[in-house]
Amino acid sequence: MKDWLDEIHWNSDGLVPAIAQDHKTGRVLMMAWMNREALSLTASENRAIYWSRSRGKLWRKGEESGHVQKLHELRLDCDADVIILMVEQIGGIACHTGRESCFYRVYENSGWKTVDPVLKDPDAIYSAGH
């Protein structure tokens, strides 16, 4: 029997894009990367765990901020090369800027306009010692 992780088309770096969506509203919260271990741990721990390309290590969402993403459902797209995580975003903040979503800018009049408010100052989030 084929391992469920073997069905994924990992890129040349062994990663797959992972999109986190709010399980109730469907709003896209963020996009990050997962390697095989991150996806396996996400499924077993029922929380979002990503691969940090900049730090070169696993990143348990919320480990510093307390803004954990509880997993409700995992989905794989038709080409088996993108994952969607349907999550409950603890604290209502997914973005390191203190916003609900990382997608807080809208293209308008040949430029990017910030449309979502900062819900909590990032300095307060990351200095709280979570």
Curated annotation (Swiss-Prot):
Function: Catalyzes the hydrolysis of the adenine ring of phosphoribosyl-AMP.
Cellular localisation: Cytoplasm
One GO CC annotation: cytoplasm
Gene Ontology MF term list: magnesium ion binding; phosphoribosyl-AMP cyclohydrolase activity; zinc ion binding
Cofactor, free-text remark: Binds 1 Mg(2+) ion per subunit. Binds 1 zinc ion per subunit.
Main localisation: cytoplasm
Assembly mode: Homodimer.
Binding site for Mg(2+): 77, 79, 81
Class of this enzyme: hydrolase
Family: Belongs to the PRA-CH family.
One biological process term in Gene Ontology: L-histidine biosynthetic process
Gene3D superfamilies in alphabetical order: Phosphoribosyl-AMP cyclohydrolase
Keywords: Amino-acid biosynthesis, Cytoplasm, Histidine biosynthesis, Hydrolase, Magnesium, Metal-binding, Zinc
Pfam family, one: PRA-CH
Top-level taxon in the UniProt lineage: Bacteria
EC number: 3.5.4.19
Organism: Pseudomonas savastanoi pv. phaseolicola (strain 1448A / Race 6) (Pseudomonas syringae pv. phaseolicola (strain 1448A / Race 6))
Binding site for Zn(2+): 78, 95, 102
High-level lineage: Bacteria, Pseudomonadati, Pseudomonadota, Gammaproteobacteria, Pseudomonadales
InterPro entries found in the cross-reference section: PRA-CH, PRib_AMP_CycHydrolase_dom, PRib_AMP_CycHydrolase_sf
Required cofactor names: Mg(2+); Zn(2+)
Pathway this chain belongs to: Amino-acid biosynthesis; L-histidine biosynthesis; L-histidine from 5-phospho-alpha-D-ribose 1-diphosphate: step 3/9
Catalyzed reaction equations: 1-(5-phospho-beta-D-ribosyl)-5'-AMP + H2O = 1-(5-phospho-beta-D-ribosyl)-5-[(5-phospho-beta-D-ribosylamino)methylideneamino]imidazole-4-carboxamide
UniProt name for this protein: Phosphoribosyl-AMP cyclohydrolase
